[in-house]
A protein has these predicted regions:
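Secreted/periplasmic proteins that engage bacterial cell-wall peptidoglycan
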Residues: 17-46, 50-63
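Non-catalytic cell-wall polysaccharide-engagement segments
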Residues: 1-16, 54-201, 206
């Protein structure tokens, strides 16, 4: 499936550990690659990555910025905030012991769970992490299907009980893996980066 690469320079600039193909697939599903996509409500999702008012406010508070709803129509701002949020979700998931919550772009379950956190909430309060903890306590594998199956029992938000959202999240993962470059550009993840840093520091000390 060939998608436009028009916004790839922005995706590369802000990708962090995220594959460009993933950001491309998400933008396609969110806005059809239309940076002008919006609605009348200031709190509604807007722009290329469909940044919500909640996500915009959270980013402003964390980074000392003052982006307005109209700023979300700037594709660079949209990608910057979107990639930042996705990176935070992946980092939050890394606290879990569940294998499918660990950053692994070759694992469709991780990708679907990441999209679920983006699309339906990721926190311990009522999002994916809450359901993941519930499943882990009961010895149930943390999978995308199981998160939706047990969301109500875990007391999660209604978004994680919506089959249409679940299907949409799957569609993002499917589109990601349909990209010929899906293996390219994914970050090494936290642990490998720490290991590389340690090795580099050791080599520096030995050479002194």
């Amino acid at each position: 499936v060939a998608l436009t690469t028009k916004f790839d320079p922005l995706f590369r600039r802000y990708q962090g550990r995220l594959p460009v193909a993933f950001l491309r697939a998400l933008a396609q599903r969110e806005s059809g690659m239309n940076p002008g996509s919006s609605s009348a409500s200031p709190q509604a999702a807007r722009g290329l990555m469909q940044i919500t008012g909640v996500a915009r406010t959270s980013y402003n508070e964390a980074n000392g910025t003052s982006y307005t709803p109209d700023d979300m129509l700037d594709p660079e701002v949209s990608v910057r905030i979107g990639a930042n949020l996705l990176g935070r979700i992946a980092g939050y998931y890394a606290k879990s012991a569940a294998p499918n919550m660990r950053e692994d772009w070759s694992n469709p379950e991780f990708v679907k769970l990441l999209v679920a956190g983006w699309n339906a909430g990721y926190s311990q309060g009522g999002g994916v992490q809450r359901v993941a903890s519930y499943l882990e306590q009961r010895g149930i594998p943390v999978t995308h299907d199981n998160v939706f199956k047990h969301a109500a029992a875990a007391g999660a938000v209604s978004y994680l009980q919506d089959p249409k959202r679940q299907a949409w999240q799957r569609s993002v993962a499917d589109l990601f893996y349909a990209q010929p470059d899906w293996r390219d550009g994914a970050g090494a993840g936290i642990l490998p980066l720490l290991l590389l840093g340690f090795m580099a520091w050791g080599a520096f000390r030995i050479s002194r």
